[in-house]
Amino acid sequence: KKNNSFSGLSLVIGLSLGHGIKHFGQGALTVIGPLLKASLSLSEVSYALIFSSMNVSSGLSNIPAGILSDMYRRKIAWLLAISMFTISFGYLLIGLTKIYILILVGVILIGFGTSFWHAPAFGTLAARYPQKKGFALSMHLTGAQIGNTLGPPIIGGLISGITLGSFIKFSGFGWETVSMLLVVPMILTGVLVLVFFKSAGIESDSNWSFQEYWERTKTLIEDKIILGLIILGAMRASIHTSFQLWLAVYLKEELDYSAWIIGWHIALITAAGIISTPIMGILSDKFGRKPVIQISMSLMAIYLFLFLIFDEGIGLVILIGLLGMFFFSVMPIVTAATMDRVPKGSEGSGTALNFIGMSLIGFMSPVISGIIYAKYNFEGISIFAGVIAVSGILLCTFLPMKKVN
């Protein structure tokens, strides 16, 4: 059938590229963050509140994104463009101000725009490729991982500067200038989405009224297995947010690395996932979601606890790379497991609920992990993230994961 065919992969590839550019900008904040923290002389808790605010905004944006994605399926391109334009305004504001409240407004815009992409994009892919959800969603996340991998070292190089022999000597820009430069690719991507993805959403037979949308959403919320999958996704997001946020600060404040070196370390978190993510998606389509999630989270837990031993040098680098094989890659598998239970036509809402859970259930993790980091340093973060991973393994073990739609 046309919807299940991979002869027409243009939508998957195009949305994956757009997702990659979005994450290129999103990952920039991880490198800019420690410099912003030092520039504004922020405490660990004040710094963590910036990312908590972003998570709350990110979670709340899924509500209108889910509603609009299911009610206006043929306007998907506009929803994706709005996502990119909102992110661009956030980075513009961060680059223009040193006032803490306005910085919060900037990251709130970035968080809102970042998650506003997910419901229309994931929902459209799940509807377009119903028998290959794992692969389609994993390919979309591969685009994100390419952006996450390229973003930090490029942003770090733009800030720190790069010297290669006597031929290339670039002294770098200030982090404020780099923040404003990010406006250009975000706006350009939004415009290109409007031009090239007018067909996104054509697989939908009709648009839902708000009443129909609400009735369908209530059935999703009342499904205990879907709620369990949302919590599982939130636990993974909490691990990712806590670890990546404080790894960057640890590399800057404890190991005294430059922004460029920090960028390369952060890039390792997602580099290996570029290869592992589509493979895991194919395996989950063939053998089921549960074994792929269980194995991935088990290895994540082991690697996280090993940071207690290997906290610098080559050991740290290898561990980050190994963790990167599963850190982000398991997310599309959890999302695909949720999509397996979502009725046709509600893919946008199912995606939105997943990301609302990731953002809102995990929104306290930056603050909690900030308190832990202030008292126990990076060792405390490793234990905190490792315990959440073990809890996720237990939850996954008891959650039924079977296609019902």
What are the residue ranges of the model-derived segments?
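A late C-terminal transmembrane helix in Major Facilitator Superfamily
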Residues: N148, K344-F378
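Helix-loop-helix hairpin linking two adjacent transmembrane segments in secondary transporters
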Residues: H140, A144-K198
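Juxtamembrane intracellular "pre-TM" segments in multi-pass secondary transporters
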Residues: K1-F6, A200-L229
